[in-house]
A protein has these predicted regions:
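Membrane-proximal helix-turn-helix segments that form the acceptor-binding/catalytic region
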Residues: 130-152, 159
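C-terminal alpha-helical cap of glycosyltransferases
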Residues: 302, 326-347
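Nucleotide-activated donor-binding/catalytic signature segment of Leloir-type glycosyltransferases, i.e.
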Residues: 229-248
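N-terminal strand-loop element at the rim of the active site
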Residues: 3, 9-14, 28-80, 224-228
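A short, well-ordered alpha-helix in the C-terminal region of glycosyltransferases
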Residues: 302, 309-323
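Conserved donor-binding/catalytic core segment of Leloir-type glycosyltransferases
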Residues: 6, 186-212, 220
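Charged catalytic cores and adjacent phosphate/nucleic-acid-binding surfaces used
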Residues: 342-368, 372-383, 402-409, 413-441, ...
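Carbohydrate-associated surface elements
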Residues: 43, 158, 177
């Protein structure tokens, strides 16, 4: 099934950049696989900006949409994306109806970060360079971003290890890719290409010294980055040494096609190495060259004097490049995208077999005096719930099941439905509520073990306040791994200090098609019913899950300061007794 894919790059599309070359290459190959691919990027080219505005105004599926003018990106700056660019990004995401949003270098304060943070599509993040990981500076913001990323990708082990320190998770390392159609072996001549920029000066000097011992050979200093000064070339070699700009792929392809030997810079571009390999050049890239530049000169001399060795290295390099073509990389990304599809559940709003049942209000999260921080007696709670017009309540005491069992017994003969549950504290991953339980589940187990214990009792896994960062919550990686085990996600908890935590839970539930739950988390009688669902009446866990398909979240908040003060007063009275 074809996917609608959005690739977001923070770098100006109008300027050469290694990330943009990667994005352009995989976009082409993903389209060849049948997907609809749109690239969102800034640009400094007027024609790009005009075409981008036109595409947004018409809602067209353009291959590339320039959503605003390019602005400099600093690794140390705060987020400085203009309001107009943010508005265009939001509009493009809405109109695109994307299945996957893939952001590149989201560790920069840029549109890639915003796209992954604000999208409700499946999110993939790619990291290229360790030095582009400074944003966001606050850990809470990084965790928030991680919660919205479904797959982490890096183009090297070094990048993956550096990114994992800031954004922990399971990384898939893929190649930067190379265009094996553009970069092909040509008629080779005695030409040595040296990648030249500020970090490669010692290697370049050593290579030029070796040129004196290699009659008939020429050297091209290929500038892959802008230089402020022209390199010094010995007077006796000026007719054999040339300087070329290699910032554009087409220019590099012409130079590398006829190069017999290529000397990559120790801190240079990974892409240039792949392009040289695709062009069939022998690489003079010995280990330790950064500390001992003379090793590069020795490697050049050996390759220049041994044609058979050059030919063998050339064939090996070409074979390596073909295994890392953009087509291969796109195939790997396609597999990643498709593997994420199973995380989303189909949204079903059918009336189903419960259409004839009456509507009731259900508060799915509350406590009794069996909890250590609550003083509500079971009978008081049942009477108050009925007085508030609730048709169903879930008793979810902290790490104890006695209150729920007592409530079920005391509710016999009442019209009120009581769901026996327990709010279980895991080892370090927050809390999990089990509904429709039969016995107590011990605290302190891992998240997965707690879920398994609920399943053993054929209970319903209800995840409360999953993004309340004022307390312990599941790690983003845990949430993604356990998605298939979550039956209900609490999207509204009336006791949360910041409403943004509820909004984040609602976004998460919508993104993955999870059934929504709501509860008051009441610890005092006045809080009962402040968060609830309007749903069809049910009997048992099966009908409960069916009823959730058509349920509506009701927010009936009261002052949190008022409710919290009542809780503290009740706790003080209990201590005085």
């Amino acid at each position: 099934m074809p996917l609608r894919i959005c690739l977001v790059t923070p770098f100006a599309w109008s300027q050469p950049h290694d990330v943009n070359e990667h994005v352009s290459g995989i976009a082409k190959e993903l389209r060849n696989l049948g997907h609809t691919v749109t690239v969102l990027a800034p640009s400094g080219r007027t024609t790009d900006l005009i075409a981008g505005r036109r595409a947004l105004a018409r809602g067209d599926d353009a291959d590339v949409i320039a959503i605003g003018a390019a602005i400099p990106i600093s690794r140390r700056s705060s987020l400085g994306v203009p309001v107009g660019v943010r508005a265009n990004l939001h509009l493009a995401m809405l109109q695109g109806r994307f299945d996957v949003v893939h952001g590149f270098e989201p560790g920069l304060p840029s549109i890639s970060y915003l796209a992954l943070r604000d999208s409700e599509a499946l999110g993939v993040a790619s990291f290229f360079a360790p030095e582009r990981l400074g944003y966001p500076p606050r850990r809470s913001l990084r965790e928030k971003l991680l919660g919205r990323i479904d797959a982490l990708v890096a183009t090297s082990r070094v990048a993956a290890e550096a990114a994992a320190e800031r954004f922990p998770g399971d990384y898939r390392v893929i190649s930067p890719g190379v265009d094996t159609e553009l970069f092909q072996p040509g008629a080779k001549r005695k030409l040595i290409v040296i990648e030249f920029h500020a970090g490669s000066l010692p290697v370049a000097r050593a290579a030029l010294r070796s040129l004196r011992e290699l009659p008939g050979w020429e050297v091209v200093l290929l500038r892959t980055k802008a230089l402020s000064t022209r390199p010094g070339i010995p007077l006796g070699l000026r007719d054999r040494v040339h300087v070329r700009s290699g910032r554009k792929a087409a220019t590099r392809a012409v130079v590398l096609a006829e190069a017999a030997i290529v000397v990559p810079a120790p801190t240079g571009s990974t892409r240039l190495r792949l392009e040289a390999a695709a062009a069939g050049a022998a690489l003079a890239d010995p280990p330790g060259v950064l500390d001992q530049p003379e090793l590069a000169a020795a490697a050049i001399a050996r390759l220049a004097e041994d044609e058979e060795l050059r030919t063998r290295r050339s064939r090996e390099a070409r074979a390596l490049a073909e295994s890392q073509s953009f087509a291969t990389v796109a195939g790997e990304l396609d597999a990643i995208y498709r593997s994420l599809g199973g995380r989303r559940r189909a949204r079903r709003r059918d009336t189903g077999p419960l259409a004839a049942r009456p509507w009731i209000l259900a508060d799915l999260h509350m406590h009794t005096s069996w909890s250590h921080d609550c003083s509500i007696e079971v009978d008081e709670l049942l009477d108050h719930a009925e007085a508030e017009g609730l048709g169903a309540i879930a008793i979810t005491d902290h790490n104890v099941f006695g209150g729920a069992a007592e409530a079920v017994e005391r509710a016999r003969g009442r019209d009120l439905i009581v769901i026996p549950g327990e709010e279980v504290k895991t080892d370090d991953q927050g809390e999990v509520i089990g509904l429709f339980l039969r016995e107590e589940i011990p605290r302190g187990m891992s998240f997965s073990e707690t879920v398994a214990a609920i399943r053993e009792q054929e209970g319903v896994v209800y995840l409360p306040h999953p993004f309340d960062r004022m307390h312990a919550i599941p790690f983003p990686t845990t949430l993604h791994r356990q998605l298939h085990e979550i039956d209900v996600l609490e999207v509204y908890n009336a006791r949360l200090l910041f409403e943004g935590y509820n909004d984040e839970a609602l976004r998460f539930a919508r993104k993955y098609g999870l059934p929504a739950g709501a509860g008051s988390d009441a610890h005092v009688l006045q809080g009962v019913g402040t968060g609830a669902l309007r749903m069809r009446s049910f009997q048992g866990p099966e009908e409960f899950l069916l009823s959730l398909r058509t349920a509506e979240v009701l927010r009936r908040p009261k002052s949190l300061a008022y409710l919290q003060s009542l809780k503290w007063v009740a706790q003080v009275k209990e201590k005085v007794r």
